Amino acid sequence: LLLHAQHIYILGVRSSSFLAGYLNFYFHLLFKNVIYVQNTAAGEIYEQMIHIGPGDVMVGISFPRYSNMGIHAIQLAHDRGADVVAITDSQLSPLYPLATAALLVSYVDSLAAPLSLINALILAVGQRKRDEVAQVFADMEQVWSKYSIFGKAEDE
């Protein structure tokens, strides 16, 4: 789904927003078509998703206690014909029935397991796009070097 999406929307609300931000950081390096749905206010979420539709993929991340704001936004994506990749904890999650594909991971008041799953997803996509990723990182290395983005250890 992700490799052929016209646009990839990423959404996580409350504690899941950290996971969504992490996924967004790396997906921006892997894809040119990522939209990170910021959730500063309920109305803004829908404004950022106004163009979502068939051919798009919404990656929705939600764990107990499931935020209604996130559930409703993912429902909108589903209703507009976008595929939904749900990253959640169980088949009882309100995201599960909306999902085209569900990635289930244990969650007991810790983001460690969901973060590991997201890392595995990033690595799997990176493997599929190996040549493109190599070119992106070669380009990034040139930019980082030219503009002295990173400091160096004293012994380098």
Residue map of PLM features:
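Internal, active-site/partner-interface "lid" segment
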Residues: R128-E156
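Glycine-rich phosphate-binding loops that contact phosphosugars or nucleotide phosphates
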Residues: Q6-V13, S17-S116, A120-K129
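A short, well-structured juxtamembrane/interface segment
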Residues: L1-H4
